[in-house]
Amino acid sequence: MQRVFCCLLFCESITMSTFSNTSSKLLMAIGAMVGVVLASNYLVQFPVDLVIAGFNLADLFTWGAFTYPIAFLVTDITNRRFGPGQARIVVLAGFALAVVLSLWLATPRIAVASGTAFLIAQLLDVSLFNRLRYSKTWWKAPVVSSVTASVLDTALFFTLAFAASLVVLGPNDDFAIEAAPLFALGFEAPRWMSWALGDLAVKVLAVALLLVPYRLLIGFIREAGSQRPDEAAV
C-alpha cells in the first residue's frame, strides 16, 4: 500500500505540471482517474480470500472489481460537465500516466491488459454517453454507456491478462488458469473466467449504486450554473 501512496503522490506532481493550463476541476478528474486505475491494477492481483456460505470468493472476485467501476463515474461526470472532448482528455491522460506507473505496481502483462481495455472501453463510454446525454431519462446515458463499456472492458482485460494462450504477453498466473467451478455453477473452467463474470457482476451493480452520487453531482453542477457543453461529433 505504501507503493500505491507513493505512486499517487508522483502522479499528482506529473499531472499538475503537465496540465498546468487546464482548469483545476479537470485536473481533479484526471487525478481521480489515474488513482482509480492505479488502485485497480494493483488490487486485481489479489483474489478476495473469504468463504461465505460455502462459497470461496477467491474463485469469484478480485479486490480490483470493487474500485474500477468508479472510473466510469469519473468519465460520465466529466462528460456531463465539460463535454466529450474534455472527457477524452481525462481518459487519455489517465491512460498514459496510470499505465506507466502500473508497470511498477503490477506486472507488465497486467499493465498492458489494463491499458488496452481501459482505453477502448472508456472511449466507447464517452461516445455512447454523448449520444444519449440529452435523453429525457436522466439515468439512460450513464447506465447504457457504463454497462456496455463494462462488458467490453471485462472481456478484454481478463482475456489479455490471464488467458493461457496469450502467454506471449507475459508469464501465466498459475492460480488464474487453474480449473475451478465456473462462477460456482458446477462445471469447471479456468478460474479467471469466474473472476471475469464476478467482475462484470460487481461493475453492473456498481453502475446502479453510483447513480446516486452521479445524480447528486449533476444537481450540484446545475446549481452552480454550469453551461451546457456543446455536443461534439463522435
Which residue stretches match the model-derived regions?
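Interfacial aromatic-anchored transmembrane helix boundaries in multi-pass membrane proteins
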Residues: 98-117
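Structural signal for membrane-spanning alpha-helices in multi-pass inner-membrane proteins
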Residues: 37-45, 101-105, 161, 214
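Membrane-embedded alpha-helical hairpins and interfacial helices in multi-pass inner-membrane proteins
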Residues: 111-230
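Residue-level recognition of pore/gate-forming positions within transmembrane alpha-helices
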Residues: 34-37, 72, 94-98, 150
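Hydrophobic transmembrane alpha-helices
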Residues: 16-85
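Cytoplasmic-side transmembrane-helix entry/capping segments in multi-pass membrane proteins
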Residues: 85-95, 140-142
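Cysteine-centered motifs
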Residues: 6-7, 11
